[in-house]
UniProtKB/Swiss-Prot annotation:
One of its GO terms (biological process) is intracellular protein transmembrane transport. This is Sec-independent protein translocase protein TatC. It comes from the Bacteria. Residues 1-29 are annotated as: Disordered. It comes from Xylanimonas cellulosilytica (strain DSM 15894 / JCM 12276 / CECT 5975 / KCTC 9989 / LMG 20990 / NBRC 107835 / XIL07). Part of the twin-arginine translocation (Tat) system that transports large folded proteins containing a characteristic twin-arginine motif in their signal peptide across membranes. Together with TatB, TatC is part of a receptor directly interacting with Tat signal peptides. Belongs to the TatC family. GO terms for molecular function: proton motive force dependent protein transmembrane transporter activity. The Tat system comprises two distinct complexes: a TatABC complex, containing multiple copies of TatA, TatB and TatC subunits, and a separate TatA complex, containing only TatA subunits. Substrates initially bind to the TatABC complex, which probably triggers association of the separate TatA complex to form the active translocon. The keyword Protein transport applies.
Amino acid sequence: MVSLTSVPPYADATPDTRASSGPAPGRRKRMPLREHLAELRTRLLLVAGGLVVGAVVGWLLYDPLLVLLTRPLHLAAATQHKDIALNFTALGSPLDTRIKVSLFLAVMVTCPWWLYQVWAFVTPGLTRREKRHAYGFLGAAVPLFLGGAGLSWWVLPHAVDIFASFVPAGSSQYVNAQEYLSFVMRLVLAFGVAFVAPVLLVALNLAGIVRHETLARGWRWAVLLAFVFAAVMTPTPDALTMVLVAAPICALYFGALGVAVWHDRRADRRTAPAAA
């Protein structure tokens, strides 16, 4: 006699995958809050370590860097035959200036390092598409910021020369070291941020916050603001310098507008069949 087993006929046909199922494609498994905080602490320590190393390098290179920073003052003094020099007004001002220059150089030099740490902390929670966008933003923002900083260095001697021209003949000008270095740092940051602003507009467009129609309607205001920014940052009597500063900013704005037009039209074509 053949004995029949009591095993259901379809017991092995559909295995239970609930316990072994992983995260959905393109997503990462959720990390507990404690692990997030531990990862954040690690990244912050790495950023702080990089800034300390950069500050030490800035401290050691302070003397040649100060010569480079004060070169526009010496050029203005030589061309206008005036007595123009850097002045330290307080007893601790030389030390404060050295610390400020060292920290500023540390932030600039270690920019790739701390940006990578931010990226390493954020990227595990991003989807594949978001990672591609982030790669594009970083790949565009860093060179644009450095380009803006380089343009500010070209503008700086012209600005110093214009300000020095207002010194009366036979007078001397002793420029406060703290104020002068703060002016240089603000100039570098202002140009860097101005060049990165179009990347932020593209990010807002990709996020669905701003459409290309809005950017197209505001192009006149964008051009006006670019020329106002150039006029304020380059107080020179000739219009050529102002145009040379404003033209790249305008070109970047229209480049961002072109990317927004391409993205919106592509998104509209993708959603049109679903709406129909």
